[in-house]
Amino acid sequence: MARAVGIDLGTTNSVVSVLEGGEPTVIANAEGARTTPSVVAFTKDGEVLVGETAKRQNVTNVDRTISSVKRHMGTDWTVGIDDKKYTSQELSARILGKLKRDAEQYLGDSVTDAVITVPAYFNDAERQATKEAGEIAGLNVLRIINEPTAAALAYGLDRGKEDELILVFDLGGGTFDVSLLEVGKDDDFSTIQVRSTAGDNRLGGDDWDQRIVDHLVKRFKESTGVDVSNDKIAKQRLKEAAEQAKKELSSSTSTSIQLPYLSLTENGPANLDETLTRAKFEELTNDLLERTRKPFEDVIREAGVSVGDVAHVVLVGGSTRMPAVVDLVKKLTGGKEPNKGVNPDEVVAVGAALQAGVLKGERKDVLLIDVTPLSLGIETKGGIMTKLIERNTAIPTKRSETFTTADDNQPSVAIQVFQGEREFTRDNKNLGTFELTGIAPAPRGIPQVEVTFDIDANGIVHVSAKDKGTGKEQSMTITGGSSLAKEDIERMVREAEEHAAEDKTRREQAEVRNNAEQLAYSIDKLIKENDDKLPEDVKSEVQGDVDGLKSALAGDDETAVKTAFDKLSASQTKLGEAIYAQGQQEQAAGEAPEGASEAKKDDEDIVDAEVVDEDDEDKKTDR
C-alpha cells in the first residue's frame, strides 16, 4: 500500500518523516543523515547531485551548484545551466524527489502522498510554487501547512491534558515566523488552533552567515589589500566557513577561521586567518536579531493575550540554536525557558507526518485549524477597502457580502481584490481584477451582486461574484497576486498602525460623500415624481438645497459637503409635510376611492423617501 509522508522543505536543509504504527519517525537519507542539505548540483558530465554530495563539491563547481532555492519560490527567478533554464519549482522538485526516494528505500514501499510545510507568511504564489514542486517530483500534495503549526502539532499532542497556549518561534535558514497556537484537549482528542501569526519571509540564518562573510571580506582586504567580493570561488569558501563559524559560536565564545590560499597576490598566495568572538558576531548581527522582536509583539497583541498566558515556548529551525536568539526569546517571554525537548531541525517534518496521518485516516485524534496572515477585501465606492476576511481568520473559510451598482443602468461591475490592513485600497496590495458583465438594466441600488471570498486549507484564495438577478457569475483564483515581499507586509501593518487616526477621518469623509450622493439622488427623484403635489415655494427651496449639495460634491471641500448635506437633510422634511398636507386636503374634499388609492400610493413613496437617510441603507446602496 502506498504511503504518505511529511516533508519539511527547508532553505538550508530538508527532512522527511513518516508515521509507523501511528507514531512519527524521521527517515535517514541514503548517506545516513536525518537532514538533507537543500542543494542541487549539475556536474559537467551531465549528472545531477542532490543533498550532501551536491554540497561537498560546491566550491569546485560553484557556477553549477544551487542552494537556498526556497528564497526564490513564487518568483520568476531562473538559473541557467548549459542550455537550459531551471525554475525554483524544478530545483525544489529535485530535492523532494531525493526525499521521496530515500523514504521509499527505507519503507520498502512506494510513496505517493505528502504534506509539505511552508513558512506561515508564505504568500499564494509561494504556496502554489511549493505545490507544483511536489507535483513535479511525483507527489500528490495532500496539504500545504505552516511550519509553526506543524511544530505545535508535533510538540503539543504529548503535553498533558489541559488547554494551553504554545508559542512557536521559528527561525530557519531563510525565513522567520512566530505563531501563537491554542491546544485544546479532551480525553481522546486534541484541537490545535492558530490564534495569530506574523513573520518575515526574508530573514533567516543565511543573513547571519552573510554578515560573517562581509566581515571576513573586509578584514581580508585590510590585511592583504585583495578584494575577494567578486571572486565566486573565494566567496563560496567564505560562506561555508561562515556557516561553520556560526555553529561553533553557539557552543564556544570564539572560533578560528583559517582559509589557506583564499586568493593570489603579486607576492604569492594570500591566506585568511581570523578569530571571531561571539561578542563580535552578535554585534555584527544585532539588527537582524531585533527584526524578530516586532513580529513577536504583534502576535501577542493580536491574539489578545499577555506573555504570562503562554504555557510553552518552542524553538524551531537550526538558527534558534544561537545563544543570542535564545536569550532574546527568554527576555520577550518574561524569562520563560524555551523547551529543549524537541529537535529544532526535525520537529516540523514530524508535525507534517502527523498531519499526513490525519488526512489519510491513520490518526483520528487531532484537528488542525490554521489562519490567513493578511486581510482580504474589495474596493467599494470612494476607494474604501471593504474587508471580507480579516487577518488571522481560521482557514478554510468562506465569506460573502452583497453589494450593488453606483450608477443607473450599469451593465457591469469591476471586482478589484486587495490584500492589506489599511482603510483605503490605494494603500493596500492589488491582487487582481475581474469583471462581472451582463447585469440587467436597472436604477442604481437595485441590482444585487454577491461577492464571495473562499480561502482553502492550503491558504490559496478564490474569489467569485454573482448577479442575483440574472444568475451571471464570474470567478478567479489568486495564484500570484499576493506575492508580497516582507517590506510590503511590514509596511502595510506598520502604516496601518501609524495612520489609524488619519484613515478613520478619511473613511468618515468618504462615508459622508457616499451618503450625500445618495440623498441628493433620492430627493431629486422624489421631487420629480411628486411635482404636481408640491407647493412651488417648498419645491424651489428643497431643489435649491439639492443643487447646492451637488455643487459641493463636485468640489474637494469636505466641510462644504457636510454643511450642504446637513442642510438638505433638514429641509427634506418639508417635502413630506407638503405631500401629507396635500393628501389630507384631497380626503377632506371627499375624493373617490381611486383618489384614496392614489394617496396610499403617495404614502408608500414617502416611506421610500424617508429610509434613504438611514446610514446602513446608504452604505449598502453605495457599494
Curated annotation (Swiss-Prot):
In the record, Phosphothreonine modifications are located at T175
Q: Of which family is this protein a member? A: Belongs to the heat shock protein 70 family.
Q: Which organism is it from?
A: Clavibacter sepedonicus (Clavibacter michiganensis subsp. sepedonicus)
- Annotated protein name in UniProt: Chaperone protein DnaK
Q: Name one GO molecular function term.
A: ATP-dependent protein folding chaperone
Keywords for this protein: ATP-binding, Chaperone, Nucleotide-binding, Phosphoprotein, Stress response
Which PANTHER family does the UniProt entry name for this protein? HEAT SHOCK PROTEIN 70KDA (PTHR19375)
Q: Which PROSITE patterns match?
A: HSP70_1 (PS00297), HSP70_2 (PS00329), HSP70_3 (PS01036)
What does the function comment of this entry state?
Acts as a chaperone.
This protein's source sits in the domain of life called Bacteria
